[in-house]
Amino acid sequence: MARQFPLEKTRNIGIMAHIDAGKTTTTERILFYTGRVHKIGEVHDGAATMDWMVQEQERGITITSAATTAQWKGHRINIIDTPGHVDFTVEVERSLRVLDGAVAVFCSVGGVEPQSETVWRQADKYGVPRIAYINKMDRMGADFFRGVSMIADRLGANPVPIQIPIGAEDQFKGIIDLVTMKAMIYTDDLGTTSDVADIPGDLVDQANEYREKLLEAVADTDEELMMKYLEGEELTEEEIRNGIRKGTIGLKFIPVVCGSSFKNKGVQPLLDAVVEYMPAPTDVPNIKGVHPETGEADERHSSDKDPFSALAFKIMADPYVGKLAFFRVYSGVLGSGSYVYNSTKGKRERIGRILQMHANHREEIPEVYAGDIAAAVGLKDTTTGDTLCDDKAPIILESMQFPDPVINVAIEPKTKQDQEKMGTALARLAEEDPTFKMHTDQDSGQTIIEGMGELHLEIIVDRLQREFKVECNVGRPQVAYKETIRRAVKSEGKFVRQSGGRGQYGHCWIEIEPLEQGSGFEFVNKIVGGVIPREYIAPIGQGIEEAMQNGIQAGYPVMDIRATVYDGSYHDVDSSEMAFKIAGSMAFKAGAAKADPAIIEPVMKVEVTVPEEYMGEVIGDMNSRRGRIEGMEATGTAQIVRGFVPLSEMFGYATDLRSKTQGRGVYVMMFDHYEEVPKNIAEGIVAKRAGA
């Protein structure tokens, strides 16, 4: 089968936004208009095609990024619908990594909400060109122009409207296209029929004002256009469109369109904008990587002729075909049944079938080309972020970084059968989601699961019950405390065991010192003159790392330290790797106790939006939770309070906030950094762990 759509006519886009700005509804409408769905699914009916997990349909939120493909005006658009809830940031992160462009959906009433900022920063990090779509223009309090100025103020972006609305709230009738200077007025409910008319008289001045701003932005992208514009010549429609495309792809500005997806208004012009202004795989820079053996920089061009390279960005357990690996092809061609080389793991794997996904129904295809997004069956060893490539031209593409979990709960299976199933089920879920981790607590023998927030873990437990039929009891959420040291010390570890036959001998001197937050663990070898043979150096590091897992004061993992081994001694006969591992562990324990140890806790960035009359109460409550207020701002009738609060003080906050504000307050929080726990609280934590 030859390529259906040329690379220039392929668009890989994501739909990203705050919860409830209408991402999934917008995607549903796109699928309806491009002929992929014959009946529109509504999120609030639990029937949206993209929200295919049971948990999503019940909660009306999108958890996993469903990938689907649609066609519009001779172009193929691969769409990834991403979740807006902060606990699922990992899904947004991995989607943005493999996209070429994104549609950022904003609610015309709420404008730029906290999660929009997080997602926006993630898109900035990957340099993803964007179109802003201001949705819900039919809602009470809709204000397109306020939305535009919020994008400029709160996101520091340069928004340029290429449309303006005709009316707002229940008077929202259509849109004015500032490129053609025509009005598009909707005449039926499905938004499939619309009349193109002249601009209503009362909006002519406003349309001219915004067209002038658009022309200015377009002229800025190109010197010839700038000269033409400054000399007062009229720019042609084609020149304007080319200028918008150039400005968007070059990240100079963000074109802004508007509509009401629920009322089917503005979705086709949004699709036109995606096709006209979003980059094709050939418009974005070549994908960078390194050669797995030499470590030298390498790259691949978006072309079918280059050697095959792809990035696996999501692993999913599927009830019918087993493990599905979603991947984005950057270069080359791949046929089903062929072998690929997983350069991250150093393994050859066979691709069984290649599927093109439409939310949760799938179509088998014989091969994929550069620029495609598809799912493969049969990749047993591949996990998120792995590179798949041609083994004759190996490359490791830049992967993604995922944050460490900040919250954990203990779970116990209800029966013996559940016990066996639970291990396999958790391993499958951990494969799908890199921010979900699990381990067994050494002391209690309990299984501990860790994640990015309460909702994240709730959904994991829910999936255990539904998909894997594992019934389990869940403990109270616990904070992922860590320990660290505050000053550098030198210490000795000596392990000598002399019993009949061969003895054990390991001896080392180490220096441990604190590092900056987020540095992890560094192990440095400064042994000279062979006082400790080379083969015993690594075991010392392993011994230190193992001791770090068991903490200093309260048994929490130790982070952000550098350990340097600088002296020691060995015995020709009695020394062994095991003896030096124990010596390393002993040296760390002896030193850490004298290094002014401290317990540190995750601190969350919190934003609370409340009506003005509850401000005092909310600020007082935040202070009582050891919070630090960073700032406040007014938006319409509400106030936003921003601050940092330790995670341990935030459990149950949703209920408290609801009762304090009569259900009118909302909040979001995301992990920000670790901070030292105050002495009185640290003592309580140590005592509790000792008592446990």
UniProtKB/Swiss-Prot annotation:
* Domain tr-type G residues, every copy: 8-282
The cellular location(s) given in this protein's UniProt record come to:
Cytoplasm
Q: Which residues form a coiled coil?
A: none
Region Disordered, annotated ranges: 285-304
Residue numbers binding GTP:
17-24, 81-85, 135-138
* Record key words, sorted: Cytoplasm, Elongation factor, GTP-binding, Nucleotide-binding, Protein biosynthesis
- Under which name does UniProt file this protein? Elongation factor G
The entry's cellular-component GO terms read: cytoplasm
Role description: Catalyzes the GTP-dependent ribosomal translocation step during translation elongation. During this step, the ribosome changes from the pre-translocational (PRE) to the post-translocational (POST) state as the newly formed A-site-bound peptidyl-tRNA and P-site-bound deacylated tRNA move to the P and E sites, respectively. Catalyzes the coordinated movement of the two tRNA molecules, the mRNA and conformational changes in the ribosome.
Q: Which family does it belong to?
A: Belongs to the TRAFAC class translation factor GTPase superfamily. Classic translation factor GTPase family. EF-G/EF-2 subfamily.
Q: Which InterPro entries match?
A: EFG_II, EFG_III, EFG_III/V, EFG_IV, EFG_V, EFG_V-like, EFTu-like_2, G_TR_CS
Per the record, the domain of life is Bacteria
List all Basic and acidic residues biased stretches: 290-304
Q: What GO biological process terms are annotated to this protein in UniProt?
A: ribosome disassembly
Named from the GO MF annotations, one term is: translation elongation factor activity
